[in-house]
């Protein structure tokens, strides 16, 4: 019996947009035979009172530890943008992976990124700036290209890039991920999981 490829969807979400996208990514990845999919979030760094006051959404996904990243064949990271970069919470989490870097524990593992922005600014920059950290770990970065047909739809406001799935939350966070954005997220999960299964052989 062949060993299943282990896929981790690892995200940070304050208001729930990236959480919703993460579920869609995991749904797509779960379609692939031979893939075992896990969804986890990085720890919140804001004090609970401030998180609640800011309108943060309580989430049920278990919290990941940096050390466990080595247990997966592919990791799909989800983060909202913060001035064209990953969120501080994701940055803090990845800054704790020095031991994994020193041992080469993530070398050759697949990595892909999806994101959320308020008005669309910084979508691609957030993904590509996150790639920098993953490249230092020797991870194999997987963009999604234009295979998802929704990327060609210009009839409505939507996220989605050849670098990875994205959603536009609106300046006040009131816009939820659209069906088109979720479809692109599912494609990203399915695509990365399919590659991981092939490489797992």
Curated annotation (Swiss-Prot):
This enzyme's EC code(s): 1.6.5.2
Q: Which InterPro entries match?
A: Flavodoxin/NO_synth (IPR008254), Flavoprotein-like_sf (IPR029039), Flavoprotein_WrbA-like (IPR010089), FMN_Rdtase-like_dom (IPR005025), NQO (IPR037513)
Family, according to the entry, reads as follows: Belongs to the WrbA family.
Positions contributing to substrate binding:
101
Cited PANTHER family: FLAVODOXIN-RELATED PROTEIN WRBA-RELATED, FLAVOPROTEIN-LIKE PROTEIN YCP4-RELATED
Return the GO cellular component terms, semicolon-separated.
Answer: membrane
Cofactor note text: Binds 1 FMN per monomer.
Pfam families under this entry?
FMN_red
Ligand binding (FMN): 13-18, 81-83, 116-121, 136
UniProt name for this protein: NAD(P)H dehydrogenase (quinone)
Q: Which organism is it from?
A: Shigella sonnei (strain Ss046)
- PROSITE patterns named in the record: FLAVODOXIN_LIKE
- Return the broad EC class: oxidoreductase
The family database entries (HAMAP family) matched by this protein are listed as:
NQOR
The protein's UniProt keywords, in alphabetical order, are: Flavoprotein, FMN, NAD, NADP, Nucleotide-binding, Oxidoreductase
């Amino acid at each position: 019996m062949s060993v299943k490829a282990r896929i981790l969807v690892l995200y940070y979400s304050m208001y729930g947009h990236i959480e919703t996208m993460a579920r869609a990514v995991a749904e797509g990845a779960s379609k692939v035979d031979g893939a075992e999919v896990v969804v986890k979030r990085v720890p919140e760094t804001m004090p609970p009172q401030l998180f609640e006051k800011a309108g943060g959404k309580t989430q049920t996904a278990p919290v990941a530890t940096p050390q466990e990243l080595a247990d997966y064949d592919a990791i799909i990271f989800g983060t909202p943008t913060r001035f064209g970069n990953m969120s501080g919470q994701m940055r803090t989490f990845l800054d704790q992976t020095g031991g994994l870097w020193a041992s080469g524990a993530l070398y050759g593992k697949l990595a892909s990124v999806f994101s959320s922005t308020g008005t669309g600014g910084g979508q691609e920059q957030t993904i590509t700036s996150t790639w920098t950290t993953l490249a230092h770990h020797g991870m194999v970065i997987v963009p999604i290209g234009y295979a998802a047909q929704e990327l060609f739809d210009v009839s409505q406001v939507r996220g989605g890039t050849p670098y990875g799935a994205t959603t536009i939350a609106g300046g006040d966070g009131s816009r939820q991920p659209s069906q088109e954005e979720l479809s692109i997220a599912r494609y990203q999960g399915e695509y990365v999981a399919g590659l991981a299964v092939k490489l797992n052989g």
